[in-house]
Every structure is written in structure tokens, then in C-alpha cells.
Amino acid sequence: MGYIESSTFRLYAEVIVGSNINKVLDYGVPENLEHITKGTAVTISLRGGKKVGVIYQIKTTTQCKKILPILGLSDSEIVLPQDLLDLLFWISQYYFAPLGKTLKLFLPAISSNVIQPKQHYRVVLKQSKAKTKEILAKLEVLHPSQGAVLKILLQHASPPGLSSLMETAKVSQSPIHSLEKLGILDIVDAAQLELQEDLLTFFPPAPKDLHPEQQSAIDKIFSSLKTSQFHTHLLFGITGSGKTEIYLRATSEALKQGKSTILLVPEIALTVQTVSLFKARFGKDVGVLHHKLSDSDKSRTWRQASEGSLRILIGPRSALFCPMKNLGLIIVDEEHDPAYKQTESPPCYHARDVAVMRGKLAHATVVLGSATPSLESYTNALSGKYVLSRLSSRAAAAHPAKISLINMNLEREKSKTKILFSQPVLKKIAERLEVGEQVLIFFNRRGYHTNVSCTVCKHTLKCPHCDMVLTFHKYANVLLCHLCNSSPKDLPQSCPKCLGTMTLQYRGSGTEKIEKILQQIFPQIRTIRIDSDTTKFKGSHETLLRQFATGKADVLIGTQMIAKGMNFSAVTLAVILNGDSGLYIPDFRASEQVFQLITQVAGRSGRSHLPGEILIQSFLPDHPTIHSAMRQDYSAFYSQEITGRELCEYPPFIRLIRCIFMGKCPKQTWEEAHRVHNILKEQLESTNPLMPVTPCGHFKIKDTFRYQFLIKSAYVIPVNKKLHHALMLAKLSPKVKFMIDVDPMTTFF
């Protein structure tokens, strides 16, 4: 339907359109839709296509002589309340993102383009792993593509999606269908394989008696809930101190008052344990929302939440934008976690800070929980902006864990060679295996070897598309770029630098090699490895965690994915193999993130009646961050870190705005960044320091070169207006894109 005379309509609507547009557009309201209200999701025409938008305002006049009509209501039946509309505009202004792009956060259950739903399938092995390996040995020579499919299926703990399997194995559907005809695998509807309710109970809840500090925190939160006034509480509790029990009781109190709750967790994987605990307490009132759900599941959850039939919602950052009826409580668990920050595309929002703003707009109580609070949150608590509650002791059955620091410089001298496991660590692992207790090993690098070079000229192999060293993954026998996930089709036969015959020299280690070494030292050991290689497919993370929690393995090896919020009662030893690795990164948050990571990993040990022990290997044993982490002394760490932040004018004493410019030509990208930078020099006041243009830490990603500069300011929105003006004046080349990251988690990468 084309443009119509505006006089045809009695009512007009200002619509926020789900497109890259930073303003509302006027549309005519047909007579049959005159009942629609502010916040209603509608279908409209834009540039010849159908889009979804949300009505911002109904009015009786328009400045347009001709106008497009609203086509109809969106199938999602979503209506955004006033507080979410206000939040949408605030996010757009604060995080420097077009209204249309920001709107997509609030409508995750539907596409901005109206498309037909598609069926999703999973691929399941019909044979045992042993039998499949026999079949693989016969097939991989005669039918390499079928062999590639079976290798992927054997590698993962749960059935992958059909499209994911095709992409990972780099095959069409043909070899998969051939294997299906041979009776080796099945292709089934994903709905048949959804995680059943009874599988969620492998983390059994136990009734808890509150200790005095917990009771004090509960009293403060209950007081906020009863007054229906906005307050933000920082629940600062050491690992294992009973923060989850406080979440449960606060949620129960909110329900008694007829209020709903949103509980945010950093990653999807953590929803399994959390949902288990909450469903055991609240039953069908609990819902889950995350981006891996189907569109129909997301639409159903949003509708139930907005109608009030679903009163508790658990999920990662995307769950924050659900239109809950009578929202009274927002909980952000592990509030310090970097996963709460959106970094891939605008708006680059931080879910913790947006949660606080949503609480303010909805007159709700906000609870931020962490054993290692961000410096920003702790500073807000000390200043009185947040209500502070401390939990300084572990819950009833748990004992304080013993922590030891191992100087790897001395261990290397003793062994006269490079080692990954010190003798004290191997001894402690052997002791746990002897008595049937479990061990957790943290190593924050995946793959087998992290550096591959030419033995002749020592040239290190890098990704041709990125400024990144390639990592060798032994199981798949590939060199992989961890930035763009590309890999050479075959291992190189000649060196690109000296042109000689390529004999590869392998250095460095990842979780895959750690697992292999452990199996060589302890032949009977049962291991589970959790990293982004073993958890690519839907349900794989949950399956591996369930296997470990139910005693199917002795040792859990993993990257930072295993550091967050997991509660394994039989784990009595946590080993951090490379405690200082993050300290070498030239970033103002490096020490904070290392301290948080060590503390969180250490907190996985000794969480029940069995005493726990933590071993930290480090080549920087005298570093103050390592010492504070070893003593679990947050106050000491905060005191030393906050002094440096204030001296150098970094958060929490100032706001940072990171301006990133990206283009295929490095010279042109640098020039365009400088053009904007020079305009801002003239516009910004001396109270807003402007840092020079520099290459990003990851200078080249996917054949795109990246430059950046930083702006420091006490107030973001006024600077954003000047930045917008500078970008308009600069008239950037269409070949150079930009992204604005307000309150960045890193100023390096």
C-alpha cells in the first residue's frame, strides 16, 4: 500500500521503527485500528518492505501531506509500558545508538523484517561412541565429508543443530543424509530434544537457615520492597556466603506483594542451576528467556510475562527488556561480570547499569550481587548512592578454603624445563583422586598450542584476515583464528616468510593440551573440558555440567566459563594454572579482572561440608593483585586500585566514551578518525580530555582495520551531542564505519 492523503485519517501515530533510524516517523491510523494505544507493536511499511515498530504517541494532527498507513498489529501482541519506552529513549541517548537499533533490544521475540518461521533440526548419533569410532575409521578415507560429520558429533556432548553441524564440518546436507540412510544418525525436530524439567534438578536445593548478616541484608531489601520506592542494594558477599538464598527470599517477598521479578545471570549456561533452584521454590511462576530460544518460545514468554501469568523471569542481559507486569524487583547476579556489556554492535549497553535505570523508572528495588564487586558499584555503595550489605562468612556447612601461592619461577628452576603443572599441584590432584573428591582446573586459553611458527626463520603464523596468532586445535587438526574463527584449509606446506619447506614448531598451551597431559600423568582419570570448543552446540554446556555434578568425571578443566556461579559439592581442590596471565594486558581494568577471576575460581572449592583448597600458580608472586587475591582481601585490592584510578582519571572518577573507526584501508580509516578528532578538539571544553587517535589492540579483524580515541567526561549525554555534531560535520566516507562504546569494559582490545 502506497502513500495516502493525510486527511484520510482521523488519528496519526508516531512510530519508532525497528531500523537504523534515529527519529520517530508519522503513520496514519486506519479506522479499524483506532483502538491501539501507546507502546503497541505494529507492522508498517518502510522503503518498500515490511518492518515492525512500536507506537510512541497517538495524535490528531501531522505535518505530512501524504502518509503511509499502519498495516496492522504485530503477531507478537507486545505492548511496551511507559517505563520501557522511557528506558528505550534513555539507552538511545546515553549509549549513542539510533532509536530503531535500540528498539530491537525490546522486541527480541520478533524480527524487524516480517518473515516466516522456520523449522529447526538436531542431529543425533544412533550408535554408541565406540561403534561410531569404528565406523569413522572406515569412512574418513573413502568419504571424508561423512568422516568430518562424525568427528564433530563425537566431539560434543549433546546433539548439535543441523545448520551448526553443516557450518562446523564445512559440508552440505548430502553427507548428513547419507549417514542417516546408513542408520548411523538421525535428524530430528529440535523440540523432541529440549531439556526436560526433571533434568534441571541435578543441582538439588537445600533449606537454609539465615545467619545474622543475611538477615540484615534481607531486612534492608524487604524495607525497599514494602515502600515501593526505588533503591539499589549492593550485596557484597564472599563466594559461598548465601547470596542465592537472599535472592530467593527477596523474590518470595515480592510475590507476596503482587510484584514480579527479573533475575539476570551473566551467561545462558548459568540459567540451568538458577532455574533449578527457583523452580524448586516457585514452580510454574518461573520462566526463562535468552537468545537461543526459538522465536515462538520467546514470544510466548514475553506474552505470559506482560499478562502476569509468569512472575519470575531468569536469563542473561536480554531478559532485562521483557515487559513484566508489576515489576518490583530486579536482581543482577555476579554484577561485576564483563558478559553484561554488549560489545559486538550498538547500543553498547551495560545490563547492570540499565537494570538500575529500569528500576528507577519502574519504582522497583534493584539488588546487585557479587563476591568481587566492580569498582564502580563498590564506590557507589561507599558514597551512600547504593545500600551496602556485607556477607563476610560462608554459609552453614561450608568451611573457609585454604589458599596457597606457588612461585612458578622456582618450580621451573627445580625442573630445569618449562612446566604446566608444578609438583605441589600434581601431588594435591593425586590426593583428591585417591579419596574420590573432585578437582577443578582453570586455564584461560583454549586450543592445544597457542603459537605455531616456522622452525627455520621463527615466523609465527597469523590469521591472514586478522592481527591474531593462529591457535592449533589438535582434535580437529586445524589452525584456528580466535577472532574470526577462520582456519586455513590445510596446514601450510611452505613458510610465507622464508618460503622454505614448512616444519612447524608448536609452543604455548591451551585447555585441550592441559587435558591431554593430565590423562598421560593419571591414566585412569576421568576428565570433562568446558570451553567454547566443547560447548558450541545447544545444550552441550548444561549436559557437561550435569555430568560433572553427578560424578561422571574426576576433574573439570576449563576457561573462564567454569569460574561463574557453579556449585559442586564434591569439589575440594581448585587449581589456577596461570594466575597472572591477564596482568600483562595494557588495560586499566586488567588488575580488577584478574582479581575477580581468581576469587571467583577459588570460590568453587569447598562449598559444602568438605574442606576446600585453592592452589594459584604464578610467575608474578609478588604482584599486589596476586597477593590480594590469594588472601581474598577485596578491601586491600580496592584501596590500591582506586588510588591509581583517581590519579590517572579513570572510572569510577570519570566516564569514558570510546570512539572506534573501522575500514578496509588503514590510511583512510586513520584520516577519517583524525577528522572527527580535530573537530572535537575545537568543540570540547578542557573538562573533557580528548585522548589521541591510536590503533586498537586488535588492530585488524576480518580484514577491517580499527582506530580509536577516548573522551573523558563527568557527563555523557552533553558530550554525545557534541560527538554527534562532529560526526555530521566530518561527513565520513561510507567506506569507514564508526561505533561508540560508552563506559567500555576495555580501552585496549
UniProtKB/Swiss-Prot annotation:
It is an enzyme of class 5 (isomerase). It catalyses: Couples ATP hydrolysis with the unwinding of duplex DNA by translocating in the 3'-5' direction; ATP + H2O = ADP + phosphate + H(+). Keywords: ATP-binding, DNA replication, DNA-binding, Helicase, Hydrolase, Isomerase, Metal-binding, Nucleotide-binding, Primosome, Zinc. SMART domains: DEXDc, HELICc. Signal peptide: none annotated. Component of the replication restart primosome. PANTHER family: PRIMOSOMAL PROTEIN N. Initiates the restart of stalled replication forks, which reloads the replicative helicase on sites other than the origin of replication. Recognizes and binds to abandoned replication forks and remodels them to uncover a helicase loading site. Promotes assembly of the primosome at these replication forks. This is Replication restart protein PriA. The lineage of its organism: Bacteria, Pseudomonadati, Chlamydiota, Chlamydiia, Chlamydiales. The gene is priA.
